[in-house]
């Protein structure tokens, strides 16, 4: 739908996510490559992606919706909630929960990777998207994957 809107010249809101770390709110746009820590963020995302593949977990390229809307590079590291979550992990203390607010719906690919990250780092990650509240803990989401099953 968003692709068709762009093709028809309609304005499409960019995906944006916000995370608070140490009292400061940080904003990330989809495909944000201008953040001062973007190399560190992308490096950690790449490590998570490799661990997912090794563990046989459904990775970012598996989501049909994402394949239609973005290149593999965008799918892998361009979604704003992934950037915000990893920024939060890098810049907060061990065991601290991560809270992210996103202006759009969280895609299946992001949902899968955040479940994996929450289990891998043993941290609670909460994401409020345009549709619902997701609380990830130990690789399980409070939404019980409703709407994300294949």
Give the predicted meaning of each segment:
Residues 1-150:
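Terminal (and in a subset, N-terminal) low-complexity or junction segments at the ends
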């Amino acid at each position: 739908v968003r692709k068709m809107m762009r093709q028809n010249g309609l304005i499409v809101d960019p995906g944006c996510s916000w995370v608070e770390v140490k009292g400061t709110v940080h904003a990330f746009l989809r495909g944000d490559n201008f953040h001062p820590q973007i190399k560190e963020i992308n490096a950690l995302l790449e490590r998570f992606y490799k661990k997912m593949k090794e563990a046989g977990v459904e990775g970012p390229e598996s989501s049909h919706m994402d394949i239609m809307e973005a290149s593999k590079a965008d799918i892998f590291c361009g979604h704003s909630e992934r950037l915000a979550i990893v920024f939060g992990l890098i810049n907060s203390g061990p065991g601290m929960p991560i809270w992210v607010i996103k202006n759009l719906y969280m895609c299946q690919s992001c949902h899968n990777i955040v479940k994996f990250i929450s289990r891998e780092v043993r941290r609670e990650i909460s994401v409020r998207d345009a549709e619902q509240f997701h609380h990830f803990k130990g690789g399980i989401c409070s939404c019980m994957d409703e709407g994300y099953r294949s």
